């Protein structure tokens, strides 16, 4: 069977070249006589893998030396608790709620202190991003938290909050590595890897040095950033396969794509094809304010929920899978992460136009 175009929000497509390299090395890696899946995390081979993966991430993202990088189990959802447990030193933090995951992060933080929602786009069903320069931030907040791209509702920030003396913490799960990011604007960046980096099973956190070491003594060992970061992510057995796959994807971005600036151009061109089509007709509708449209997650609906179901079923039969929208939104969602080839977008648009003509 031919490979399908997988528009899943995560786990999602991986570059075919990366998959083929992993396939070639699956049974035996680098003269070790064993698979990465079965080798000791203390072996010289895996030590080289994790060291090289971190070094490549630092190069690709231009991460300064005063930031630590850690490979964590538990996904981004675990980070919702780790952030307040480690950083909420004043007992309060500001949260901007622009969708489901930022709302869940705020709810989790409220278990450990005052998680003040200083702005929200819920009033328009999360179809825009609040003006970050018009928000009344708390100068005594321990940090400001955002979700930089909203997977479910298809929005993204065009600028981020910058408040002197208050660190910015960002969940970048669904946009990481899609474009260059100025790491110095953030105190902490975290992301689950299953959308744009690697298979499911890991989160990566990038934490500025001055934010570490302030967790209370009763914070569980594995919920303390310092535990893993002080041991170069080797305090316990790390998610070895995910780290290996992350390394392959990063090398692909660096060597084949030519870095994140090139990746951004490719992604913006792909998204433009789909948005231009959506704007050219009145059968399918994208509700997001144009300025805040996500480059990674494109949401749309047809005139009727039954037609939405029909579209998703016929699309799957045609080789376009996982287009069903999130249960909170309905409709359709095309997640067009880094690994989605441009031809996948072109063919999807052709299918959408065919469906429109047959069902309008």
Predicted features, each with a name:
Residues 284-314:
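Conserved PLP-binding catalytic core of the aspartate aminotransferase-like
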Residues 188, 193-275, 289, 358-360:
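Active-site C-terminal subdomain of aminotransferase-like
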Residues 33-79, 86, 100, 108:
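Conserved N-terminal alpha-helix of the aminotransferase class I/II PLP-enzyme fold
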Residues 2-4, 330-360:
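PLP-dependent enzyme catalytic core of the Aspartate aminotransferase-like
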């Amino acid at each position: 069977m031919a490979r399908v175009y997988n528009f899943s929000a995560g786990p999602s497509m991986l570059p075919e070249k990366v998959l083929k390299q992993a396939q070639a090395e699956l049974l035996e890696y680098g003269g070790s006589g064993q698979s990465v899946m079965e080798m000791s995390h203390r072996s010289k081979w895996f030590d080289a893998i994790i060291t090289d993966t971190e070094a490549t991430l630092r190069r690709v993202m231009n991460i300064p030396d005063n930031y630590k990088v850690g490979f964590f189990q538990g996904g981004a959802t675990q980070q919702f608790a780790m952030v307040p447990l480690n950083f909420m030193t004043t007992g309060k933090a500001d949260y901007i709620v622009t969708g489901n995951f930022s709302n869940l992060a705020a709810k989790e933080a409220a278990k450990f202190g005052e998680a003040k929602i200083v702005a929200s786009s819920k009033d328009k069903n999360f179809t825009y991003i609040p003006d970050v320069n018009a928000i009344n931030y708390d100068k005594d907040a321990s940090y400001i938290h955002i979700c930089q791209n909203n997977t479910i509702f298809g929005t993204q920030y065009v600028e981020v909050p910058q408040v002197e003396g208050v660190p910015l913490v960002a969940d970048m799960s669904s946009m990481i590595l899609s474009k260059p990011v100025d790491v110095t604007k953030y105190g902490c960046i975290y992301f689950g890897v299953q959308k744009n980096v690697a298979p499911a099973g890991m989160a990566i956190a990038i934490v500025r040095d001055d934010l570490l070491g302030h967790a209370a003594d009763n914070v569980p060992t594995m919920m303390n950033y310092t535990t893993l970061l002080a041991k170069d992510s080797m305090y316990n057995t790390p998610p070895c396969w995910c780290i290996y796959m992350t390394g392959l994807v990063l090398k692909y971005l660096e060597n084949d794509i030519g870095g994140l600036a090139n990746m951004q151009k490719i992604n913006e061109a792909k998204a433009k094809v789909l948005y231009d089509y959506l704007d050219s007709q009145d059968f399918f509708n994208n509700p997001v304010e144009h300025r805040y449209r996500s480059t990674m997650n494109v949401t749309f609906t047809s005139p009727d929920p039954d037609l939405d179901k029909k579209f998703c079923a016929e699309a799957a039969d045609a080789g376009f899978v996982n287009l069903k929208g999130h249960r909170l939104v309905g409709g359709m969602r095309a997640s067009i992460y880094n690994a989605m080839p441009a031809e996948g977008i072109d063919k999807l648009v052709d299918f959408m136009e065919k469906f429109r003509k047959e069902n309008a």
